[in-house]
Amino acid sequence: MPNTSFPVPSKFPLGPPAAVCGSGETLRPAPPSGGTMKAAEEEHYSYVSPSVTSTLPLPTAHSALPAACHDLQTSTPGISAVPSANHPPSYGGAVDSGPSGYFLSSGNTRPNGAPTLESPRIEITSYLGLHHGSGQFFHDVEVEDVLPSCKRSPSTATLHLPSLEAYRDPSCLSPASSLSSRSCNSEASSYESNYSYPYASPQTSPWQSPCVSPKTTDPEEGFPRSLGACHLLGSPRHSPSTSPRASITEESWLGARGSRPTSPCNKRKYSLNGRQPSCSPHHSPTPSPHGSPRVSVTEDTWLGNTTQYTSSAIVAAINALTTDSTLDLGDGVPIKSRKTALEHAPSVALKVEPAGEDLGTTPPTSDFPPEEYTFQHLRKGAFCEQYLSVPQASYQWAKPKSLSPTSYMSPSLPALDWQLPSHSGPYELRIEVQPKSHHRAHYETEGSRGAVKASAGGHPIVQLHGYLENEPLTLQLFIGTADDRLLRPHAFYQVHRITGKTVSTTSHEIILSNTKVLEIPLLPENNMRAIIDCAGILKLRNSDIELRKGETDIGRKNTRVRLVFRVHIPQPNGRTLSLQVASNPIECSQRSAQELPLVEKQSTDSYPVIGGKKMVLSGHNFLQDSKVIFVEKAPDGHHVWEMEAKTDRDLCKPNSLVVEIPPFRNQRITSPAQVSFYVCNGKRKRSQYQRFTYLPANGNSVFLTLSSESELRGGFY
């Protein structure tokens, strides 16, 4: 193997050779060389012998760099890297003042008394005057003040290393771009080691470093010298290879560490004698004098990008694009190392608004973390602290009360899928004005299409009758199904809160069991009457809803909904009376509203089993060949009875249809029988099911049938 020599920075003093930690080659006696002794003046200028076979230049370190960044601290020292096969692998270093057995005879000596090292090699004399005591190992050397140039004594150390290929990252273009030469860290580098660059950790570095791990410096010494060294943080040079490892977590700090040598640059802060301080993922108390230009790199950002970028220019561009714009606003301490507070983190000012009069004075924002804020008390504003102040309404929304475990807790309110009556005792919840039969619902990606309107203009009106108290109540509104099954919240449609200049009703939006519920106040001064001009209909994505368990039974083709209103009335005995009423069906699809028949009103909803009476249906999209089908279903949904009613085609209009009620299948029933009917314009063009009740037959049923037929012939229709 050819000898390879290259200069590397060194602060090693003159002394006997010593083996240090690492996996390299130990020193061996230098073979005789026929070269002559070079003068000390030539060594100061890094004179290179012409007999050098292979050289690998490395950048020399600046004398102002701290010892924490690199342990070899002379400006232009010379170290010869000579592979050796006679000694076990380890890092070793020999100095010029070692035993004579390592060098030539005493005749070939330098002016300073040191013998000539072997050739071919590169030999550079240090400018820095380093003094040492009796210690013979590198980690026992103490760095003293730099002497003037006239008093500096030359010192040369020899470091034998194994083959250079073992320390080179195959994807790196030069040793300067290795993972271990990313930056120079000060004593506050633990901030960036924990958060910014997980691949810079010495315990997780995949490539070994050709340099010996440096000695830890004292905080008093390392901090001032790091002022000039930390300018390297802004260097545009970055490693062309990315790291496949995840970020440093609490578990990785507590886990076992490997035994292989680690990279320098003060990443592992303990000396070469094996004394290892306790590693902690917590922040270092000493701040960094310069802000870090890097951003946090997490596991999510590294996965999938481990082999894509192999050029340092691409990595530099990515880092420039992802650099936090708020880094220059700080005081020099990296963003990741600062204490999390409201004045540092957010880019939008957050103002705390009292939720009610009983909230009291708001404590300072620095006394509690942001996660203690509630969503209702946060308002976004600009840095200029200007926003539109909206006057608070007289109606205060109910706040959740914190109850102790020993306090009495009343039963919870009924679920949204419970079937509740519309009247009970003196109370009745009634829809005074029904909504329009068609309303175009809007999607989440488009703008609102306004509030639901009434058929005759305006908006729906709901009123609670029989309530004589002076306390206001809350009217709840949600979107329910409009099929023939039991009423329940619709999975594909939600209520949408409408705001604007033309909205006169105050509303508040909450979520109950994945269903949006709009709360509207019912005030005694308004006779417990509310105009619903603040409710729209929102269409959710089918893919999002169908992933939920138990929601696919509704079907994406079910585009008809109802407005469901609820009110909870407290009783003197401590209980709560809940009433519910649902509106007429509302078609939310524009295409369905133009093609499917829709029944809005029927002239009668019950008749005796003998049938024969004329019934008028009002709605939309009725045709001359429209059919009306009466159906009786079993509890399991199976059709027990199905009959087509006769239609009067002469009286048929697009918005009205006259049919004859067919006789029921069982003429001897003793209790009312519930059936349904629908209008059909084709195979797949059916209206929603409408309810109808058959009554038991008696002596007056025949008279009622005959009288109704005579009224029809008299010209009522």
Curated annotation (Swiss-Prot):
Post-translational modification: Phosphorylated by NFATC-kinase and GSK3B; phosphorylation induces NFATC1 nuclear exit and dephosphorylation by calcineurin promotes nuclear import. Phosphorylation by PKA and DYRK2 negatively modulates nuclear accumulation, and promotes subsequent phosphorylation by GSK3B or casein kinase 1.
Calcineurin-binding: annotated span: 120-125
Phosphoserine modifications at: S235, S239, S247, S271, S296
GO biological process: aortic valve development; aortic valve morphogenesis; B-1a B cell differentiation; branching involved in lymph vessel morphogenesis; calcineurin-NFAT signaling cascade; calcium ion transport; cellular response to calcium ion; endocardial cushion development
Residue ranges: DNA binding: 440-447
Keyword entries, A-Z: Activator, Cytoplasm, DNA-binding, Nucleus, Phosphoprotein, Repeat, Transcription, Transcription regulation
Region described as 3 X SP repeats: spans on this chain: 205-300
Induction comment from the UniProt entry of this chain: Induced in T-lymphocytes upon activation of the T-cell receptor (TCR) complex. Induced after addition of phorbol 12-myristate 13-acetate (PMA). Induced by calcium in pre-osteoblasts and osteoblasts. Expressed during osteoclastogenesis, its induction and activation is regulated by TNFSF11/RANKL.
Residue intervals of the RHD domain: 411-593
Record bears the keyword Nuclease: no
Extent of motif Nuclear export signal: 312-323
Region ranges (Disordered): 1-38, 202-298
Ranges of the Sequence repeats in the UniProt entry: 205-221, 235-251, 284-300
Short motif (Nuclear localization signal): ranges: 267-269, 683-685
Signal peptide feature range: none
Biased segments, Polar residues type: 203-216, 238-250
Chief site of localization: cytoplasm
Tissue specificity annotation: Expressed in the submandibular gland (at protein level). Expressed in basal epidermal cells (at protein level). Expressed in spleen, skeletal muscle and skin. Express in the lung and thymus. Weakly expressed in heart, brain, liver and kidney. Not expressed in testis. Expressed in osteoclasts. Also expressed during TNFSF11/RANKL-induced differentiation of bone marrow-derived macrophages to osteoclasts.
An example molecular function term from Gene Ontology annotations: sequence-specific DNA binding
PANTHER family: NFAT, NUCLEAR FACTOR OF ACTIVATED T-CELLS, CYTOPLASMIC 1
Oligomer and partners: Member of the multicomponent NFATC transcription complex that consists of at least two components, a pre-existing cytoplasmic component NFATC2 and an inducible nuclear component NFATC1. Other members such as NFATC4, NFATC3 or members of the activating protein-1 family, MAF, GATA4 and Cbp/p300 can also bind the complex. NFATC proteins bind to DNA as monomers. Interacts with HOMER2 and HOMER3; this interaction may compete with calcineurin/PPP3CA-binding and hence prevent NFATC1 dephosphorylation and activation. Interacts with TLE6/GRG6.
Main function: Plays a role in the inducible expression of cytokine genes in T-cells, especially in the induction of the IL-2 or IL-4 gene transcription. Also controls gene expression in embryonic cardiac cells. Could regulate not only the activation and proliferation but also the differentiation and programmed death of T-lymphocytes as well as lymphoid and non-lymphoid cells. Required for osteoclastogenesis and regulates many genes important for osteoclast differentiation and function.
Free-text note regarding domains: Rel Similarity Domain (RSD) allows DNA-binding and cooperative interactions with AP1 factors.
UniProt name for this protein: Nuclear factor of activated T-cells, cytoplasmic 1
